[in-house]
UniProtKB/Swiss-Prot annotation:
Originating species: Trichodesmium erythraeum (strain IMS101)
Coiled-coil residue windows: none
Stored NCBIfam families: rplN_bact
Domain of life: Bacteria
Keywords: Ribonucleoprotein, Ribosomal protein, RNA-binding, rRNA-binding
Gene: rplN
GO-annotated cellular components: cytosolic large ribosomal subunit
Its biological purpose: Binds to 23S rRNA. Forms part of two intersubunit bridges in the 70S ribosome.
Name of the molecule in the record: Large ribosomal subunit protein uL14
A biological process term (GO) from this entry: translation
Single GO MF descriptor: large ribosomal subunit rRNA binding
Subunit: Part of the 50S ribosomal subunit. Forms a cluster with proteins L3 and L19. In the 70S ribosome, L14 and L19 interact and together make contacts with the 16S rRNA in bridges B5 and B8.
Native organism taxonomy: Bacteria, Bacillati, Cyanobacteriota, Cyanophyceae, Oscillatoriophycideae
Length: 122
């Protein structure tokens, strides 16, 4: 569960390292974001000489959360960290690589490019 002021790791090579959520996209007053939801975030830490700079406002999709995700089969899945991938307006990732595992639910939400770049899909 990601809400405003939540800090997330960045799971791609766009240049950002840490994000802080400033808005959950969708619905009028939506409070929480889960895996596969789009957020608006500000870059809190970034690598030098990369495409994304510190204090940039970006769109990102949540790919991992510490809060467990319950599937229809009854299985529950949770990760060790909260992580997101920075995307552009079209929903494509700004980086060329994705680090760490991502959840299968991203495929259902039409983030197939992120799923194809990920080394492991759980």
């Amino acid at each position: 569960m990601i809400q405003q002021q939540s800090l997330l790791n960045v799971a791609d090579n766009s240049g950002a390292r840490k994000l802080m959520c400033i808005r959950v996209v969708g619905g009028g007053n939506r409070r929480y974001a889960h895996i596969g939801d789009v957020i608006i975030a500000v870059v809190k830490d970034a690598s030098p000489n990369m495409a994304v700079k510190k204090s940039d406002v970006v769109r990102a999709v949540v790919v991992r959360t510490k809060k467990g995700l319950r599937r229809d089969s009854g299985m529950s899945i949770r990760f060790d960290d909260n992580a997101a991938v920075i995307i552009n307006q079209d929903g494509n990732p700004r980086g060329t690589r994705v680090f760490g595992p991502v959840a299968r639910e991203l495929r259902d939400k039409n983030f197939t490019k992120i799923v194809s770049l990920a080394p492991e899909v759980l």
